[in-house]
A protein has these predicted regions:
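Membrane-interfacial helix-loop segments of redox and metal-homeostasis proteins
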Residues: 2-204
Length: 204
Protein backbone atom coordinates (compact mmCIF):
# COMPACT_ATOMS: atom_id res chain seq x y z
CA UNK A 1 0.00 0.00 0.00
CA UNK A 2 1.17 3.51 -0.70
CA UNK A 3 -0.22 6.21 1.58
CA UNK A 4 1.21 9.60 2.28
CA UNK A 5 0.11 12.66 4.20
CA UNK A 6 2.17 15.39 5.83
CA UNK A 7 2.39 15.04 9.60
CA UNK A 8 0.65 18.36 10.14
CA UNK A 9 -2.23 17.30 7.91
CA UNK A 10 -2.66 14.01 9.76
CA UNK A 11 -2.76 15.87 13.07
CA UNK A 12 -5.35 18.24 11.62
CA UNK A 13 -7.46 15.31 10.53
CA UNK A 14 -7.34 13.78 14.00
CA UNK A 15 -8.23 17.10 15.54
CA UNK A 16 -11.25 17.50 13.29
CA UNK A 17 -12.40 14.01 14.31
CA UNK A 18 -12.03 14.94 17.98
CA UNK A 19 -14.38 17.86 17.40
CA UNK A 20 -16.98 15.48 16.05
CA UNK A 21 -16.95 16.98 12.56
CA UNK A 22 -17.13 13.56 10.93
CA UNK A 23 -17.28 9.86 11.70
CA UNK A 24 -13.71 8.65 11.30
CA UNK A 25 -10.70 10.81 10.56
CA UNK A 26 -10.63 13.31 7.72
CA UNK A 27 -7.02 13.71 6.62
CA UNK A 28 -6.46 16.41 3.99
CA UNK A 29 -3.77 15.45 1.52
CA UNK A 30 -3.91 11.72 2.28
CA UNK A 31 -2.75 9.84 -0.83
CA UNK A 32 -3.44 6.11 -1.18
CA UNK A 33 -2.33 4.32 -4.36
CA UNK A 34 -1.90 7.66 -6.10
CA UNK A 35 -5.38 8.85 -5.18
CA UNK A 36 -6.27 11.57 -2.69
CA UNK A 37 -8.96 10.31 -0.31
CA UNK A 38 -11.80 12.68 0.52
CA UNK A 39 -13.93 10.67 2.95
CA UNK A 40 -13.17 9.77 6.59
CA UNK A 41 -10.84 6.86 7.27
CA UNK A 42 -9.69 4.56 10.07
CA UNK A 43 -6.29 3.05 10.75
CA UNK A 44 -6.67 -0.63 9.83
CA UNK A 45 -3.90 -1.62 12.24
CA UNK A 46 -5.78 -0.07 15.17
CA UNK A 47 -9.00 -1.78 14.10
CA UNK A 48 -7.30 -5.18 13.97
CA UNK A 49 -5.59 -4.61 17.31
CA UNK A 50 -8.95 -3.71 18.84
CA UNK A 51 -10.43 -6.91 17.43
CA UNK A 52 -7.62 -8.87 19.07
CA UNK A 53 -8.21 -7.23 22.44
CA UNK A 54 -11.95 -7.91 22.37
CA UNK A 55 -11.25 -11.49 21.29
CA UNK A 56 -9.02 -12.10 24.32
CA UNK A 57 -11.54 -10.53 26.70
CA UNK A 58 -14.38 -12.52 25.15
CA UNK A 59 -12.37 -15.76 25.25
CA UNK A 60 -11.77 -15.38 28.97
CA UNK A 61 -15.49 -14.84 29.61
CA UNK A 62 -16.36 -17.81 27.38
CA UNK A 63 -13.92 -20.02 29.29
CA UNK A 64 -15.65 -19.24 32.58
CA UNK A 65 -19.03 -20.08 31.05
CA UNK A 66 -17.88 -23.26 29.32
CA UNK A 67 -15.57 -24.83 31.88
CA UNK A 68 -16.95 -23.55 35.19
CA UNK A 69 -20.55 -22.71 34.20
CA UNK A 70 -20.08 -19.22 35.59
CA UNK A 71 -21.92 -16.71 33.45
CA UNK A 72 -21.32 -13.50 35.38
CA UNK A 73 -18.09 -12.76 33.41
CA UNK A 74 -19.94 -13.36 30.13
CA UNK A 75 -22.78 -11.15 31.31
CA UNK A 76 -20.34 -8.36 32.24
CA UNK A 77 -18.39 -8.65 28.98
CA UNK A 78 -21.59 -8.60 26.90
CA UNK A 79 -22.65 -5.38 28.62
CA UNK A 80 -19.18 -3.89 28.11
CA UNK A 81 -19.18 -4.83 24.42
CA UNK A 82 -22.60 -3.22 24.05
CA UNK A 83 -21.13 0.06 25.29
CA UNK A 84 -17.95 -0.43 23.24
CA UNK A 85 -19.75 -0.94 19.94
CA UNK A 86 -22.29 1.78 20.67
CA UNK A 87 -19.42 4.25 21.03
CA UNK A 88 -17.75 2.93 17.87
CA UNK A 89 -20.90 3.22 15.77
CA UNK A 90 -21.74 6.67 17.12
CA UNK A 91 -18.38 8.40 17.45
CA UNK A 92 -15.73 6.10 15.99
CA UNK A 93 -13.18 3.69 17.40
CA UNK A 94 -10.80 6.35 18.71
CA UNK A 95 -13.25 7.19 21.52
CA UNK A 96 -14.06 3.66 22.66
CA UNK A 97 -12.12 2.11 25.57
CA UNK A 98 -10.73 -0.75 23.48
CA UNK A 99 -10.01 1.60 20.60
CA UNK A 100 -7.92 3.82 22.86
CA UNK A 101 -5.91 0.82 24.04
CA UNK A 102 -5.42 -0.34 20.44
CA UNK A 103 -4.24 3.09 19.39
CA UNK A 104 -1.67 3.05 22.18
CA UNK A 105 -0.42 -0.37 21.10
CA UNK A 106 -0.10 0.70 17.45
CA UNK A 107 1.35 4.16 18.09
CA UNK A 108 4.78 3.25 16.68
CA UNK A 109 3.48 1.47 13.58
CA UNK A 110 2.85 3.22 10.28
CA UNK A 111 -0.91 3.54 9.72
CA UNK A 112 -2.85 1.78 6.99
CA UNK A 113 -5.80 3.97 6.12
CA UNK A 114 -9.12 2.47 5.00
CA UNK A 115 -12.58 3.95 4.50
CA UNK A 116 -14.60 4.29 7.69
CA UNK A 117 -18.04 3.48 6.25
CA UNK A 118 -17.71 -0.33 5.87
CA UNK A 119 -16.25 -0.58 9.38
CA UNK A 120 -19.24 1.26 10.77
CA UNK A 121 -21.52 -1.23 9.01
CA UNK A 122 -19.57 -4.12 10.55
CA UNK A 123 -19.64 -2.58 14.02
CA UNK A 124 -23.40 -2.10 13.71
CA UNK A 125 -23.65 -5.88 13.34
CA UNK A 126 -21.42 -6.23 16.40
CA UNK A 127 -23.68 -3.84 18.28
CA UNK A 128 -26.70 -5.98 17.44
CA UNK A 129 -24.98 -9.16 18.62
CA UNK A 130 -23.80 -7.45 21.82
CA UNK A 131 -27.34 -6.22 22.50
CA UNK A 132 -28.74 -9.72 22.00
CA UNK A 133 -26.06 -11.21 24.25
CA UNK A 134 -26.73 -8.62 26.95
CA UNK A 135 -30.46 -9.39 26.91
CA UNK A 136 -29.87 -13.16 26.90
CA UNK A 137 -27.31 -13.22 29.70
CA UNK A 138 -29.22 -10.76 31.88
CA UNK A 139 -32.40 -12.81 31.39
CA UNK A 140 -30.79 -15.80 33.05
CA UNK A 141 -30.54 -17.86 29.86
CA UNK A 142 -27.66 -20.31 30.13
CA UNK A 143 -26.22 -23.20 28.16
CA UNK A 144 -25.43 -23.32 24.46
CA UNK A 145 -27.48 -20.32 23.40
CA UNK A 146 -25.16 -17.66 24.86
CA UNK A 147 -22.08 -19.82 24.37
CA UNK A 148 -22.82 -20.36 20.68
CA UNK A 149 -23.33 -16.65 20.10
CA UNK A 150 -20.09 -15.98 21.93
CA UNK A 151 -18.26 -18.45 19.70
CA UNK A 152 -19.58 -16.68 16.61
CA UNK A 153 -18.28 -13.38 17.95
CA UNK A 154 -14.90 -14.87 18.84
CA UNK A 155 -14.58 -16.34 15.36
CA UNK A 156 -15.32 -13.01 13.71
CA UNK A 157 -12.85 -11.23 15.99
CA UNK A 158 -10.15 -13.79 15.28
CA UNK A 159 -10.66 -13.53 11.53
CA UNK A 160 -10.23 -9.76 11.62
CA UNK A 161 -7.36 -9.60 14.10
CA UNK A 162 -5.32 -12.52 12.73
CA UNK A 163 -6.20 -12.54 9.03
CA UNK A 164 -7.50 -9.03 8.43
CA UNK A 165 -10.80 -10.48 7.22
CA UNK A 166 -13.72 -8.25 8.16
CA UNK A 167 -16.87 -10.32 7.64
CA UNK A 168 -19.10 -7.31 8.17
CA UNK A 169 -17.19 -5.45 5.45
CA UNK A 170 -17.55 -8.51 3.20
CA UNK A 171 -21.30 -8.42 3.77
CA UNK A 172 -21.31 -4.69 2.98
CA UNK A 173 -19.58 -5.38 -0.34
CA UNK A 174 -21.91 -8.28 -1.14
CA UNK A 175 -24.96 -6.08 -0.60
CA UNK A 176 -23.43 -3.24 -2.61
CA UNK A 177 -22.56 -5.44 -5.58
CA UNK A 178 -26.18 -6.57 -5.76
CA UNK A 179 -27.46 -3.03 -5.67
CA UNK A 180 -29.03 -3.35 -2.24
CA UNK A 181 -26.74 -0.61 -0.98
CA UNK A 182 -26.44 2.49 -3.15
CA UNK A 183 -23.06 3.75 -4.33
CA UNK A 184 -21.44 5.68 -1.51
CA UNK A 185 -18.52 7.99 -2.29
CA UNK A 186 -17.45 7.62 1.35
CA UNK A 187 -16.24 4.10 0.47
CA UNK A 188 -12.98 4.78 -1.36
CA UNK A 189 -10.45 2.23 -0.17
CA UNK A 190 -10.71 -1.19 1.46
CA UNK A 191 -8.14 -3.32 3.27
CA UNK A 192 -7.25 -6.37 1.16
CA UNK A 193 -10.43 -5.95 -0.87
CA UNK A 194 -12.58 -6.61 2.20
CA UNK A 195 -15.58 -4.65 0.94
CA UNK A 196 -14.98 -5.23 -2.79
CA UNK A 197 -17.33 -2.62 -4.17
CA UNK A 198 -16.86 -1.54 -7.79
CA UNK A 199 -16.02 2.07 -6.92
CA UNK A 200 -13.50 1.30 -4.15
CA UNK A 201 -9.75 0.83 -4.35
CA UNK A 202 -8.03 -2.17 -2.80
CA UNK A 203 -5.23 -1.64 -0.30
CA UNK A 204 -2.59 -4.29 0.31
Amino acid sequence: MSSTAPRAEIDEGLHNGALGVSFGQRIPGLIVNGRELQAPVFNEHEVRAAAGITMVVGAVAFSFAYFQHQYIPLQAVASFFLLEFLIRVTFGIRYSPVGMAARLLMRNQAPQWVSAKPKRFAWTIGLGIALAMTIITNSGIRGWTPRSMCLVCLTMMWLESALGLCLGCKLYGWLARRGWIAKDDAVEVCADGSCEVPWAKEVQ
